Structures are given as structure tokens and as C-alpha cells.
Amino acid sequence: MFDSLVDFLKTNIDELNGHEVRISSEFKEHHNEDSKYIIKNWLFSSPEYRKWRITRLDGGKKLQVFNTVAYPNFDCEMPILGADILWFGTSQKLLAILDYQPLIQEGKYLEKYCSSLGIIKKKYSAFDNNKMKNIYDSKKYFSPWVIICRGNKLNLDRDLNNIFHSFVNNYLKIHKSNPVNQFLDTEKIKINQIKYDKYSFEKDPADKLFKSFFGEKWTKKFVNKFLFTLNNEIIY
């Protein structure tokens, strides 16, 4: 499950003249002690994106997880693309959160880079779950148009691929239009990406999930050295 999303991203990254970055074997593929859960990771870089990572967690019929985060270069003020998709097989429930995660919460910045998410949401009513917005801090790294779905197998089979493709294609379209930086210079972009990693290191709900499956020692290393590598950077 979700392999088609991985393949879709790989194709798009390849078209961006991206290349896969070698990562530690313990992150590339890792099994828990009884081999019920397997996590696989990929890391890419391209001329426009300093880091684009993908994570797939295979828990068999019980749980499937897909995550991707794309960080633009420090000379681009665009939001960070972030997607979390979880399928709970036992309860047949889909949870998806897709967003262009803004570096700042200024209204004109949000309108320029994030508002087009609203058009995508209108096409898929199941992915417009405002009731769940309270679980995220809207004053930090989430846009007012964050796409949230708490759906079922119909949404998984019928809608997910289409909305994910629209979500990624629209983001790439914005980037390819070469928007001029209006709000942040290179130094501030870097600082805000560092702050994003520090915030995510503290708040990411997946941390508990990984600890329960793969243990605290491996998870701590994984979060610091693969997921949020700027967490240890010092801001002067």
C-alpha cells in the first residue's frame, strides 16, 4: 500500500533533475525485533530542493503509513511540503494531513503560497475536515487551508491518489513559476527552516509511534539524523 505514491514522487523528483542521496543502512530499511513492522526511507536532493524525504511504514493489515517532506533551498521562501497518510486496517479508517507548511504566518505570504490548497479541498469534501484542526497549532507551521481527511476505504481507493497528485503537482507548479522572494531573505529562510525542524522534533506525533514499534534508542537517532536534521543547529 502507498507504493504508488512513492513511485509518483520518485518520477517527479527525477523530472526535477533530482538524485537519491545515500543514507545509513539502519534507516534505509529497518525491522522491529519480531519483524511485524518494516520501515523504509528514501532521501533525495535536486537543484531546487535541498532535501526531499519519503518514509513508508509497513505494518501489514494492521497499519500502513506514508510520509513525505520537501524542503526548498535556503534561497527560496516557499513553504515546506508536508504529507502524513495513515491507514488503520482493523478499523478501516484513513487519516491524511496534507499542507504547504508556511515559514511565517503573514497573511499575504499565506495567500501567495498556500491559498490554492482551498481549490483542491473543494473538489474532495471528505478531505475538508475542519473538526480536526484543533489538533494542530494553526499559529505555527500549518496553513489555514491544511487538508485533513478522516475517511474510510472508499476515500482510500477512490480519492487519495487523485488528491495527492493534485497536491504535489500544484506545489511544483508554484515553485516552477519562480516566485520572487517578498517576505524573507536567505538568512531568515534558513532560520525558519531550522525552527521548523526544532518545532517538529518536539511536536511530531509519529515519535510515539516509532518508539512503540522500533524502540527509543533507534527512534531518537532516526528523528535526529534523518527526519529533522536541522534540530541540532544553533540559531544565532
UniProtKB/Swiss-Prot annotation:
Chain segments annotated as coiled-coil in the UniProt record: none
GO biological process, one term: phytochromobilin biosynthetic process
GO molecular function: 15,16-dihydrobiliverdin:ferredoxin oxidoreductase activity; cobalt ion binding
Catalytic activity: 15,16-dihydrobiliverdin + oxidized 2[4Fe-4S]-[ferredoxin] = biliverdin IXalpha + reduced 2[4Fe-4S]-[ferredoxin] + 2 H(+)
Enzyme Commission designation: 1.3.7.2
Top EC group: oxidoreductase
InterPro entries assigned: DiHydbiliverdin_OxRdtase, Ferredoxin-dep_bilin_Rdtase
Keywords assigned: Oxidoreductase
Function statement: Catalyzes the two-electron reduction of biliverdin IX-alpha at the C15 methine bridge.
NCBIfam families: PRK13246.1
Family: Belongs to the HY2 family.
Protein name listed in UniProt: 15,16-dihydrobiliverdin:ferredoxin oxidoreductase
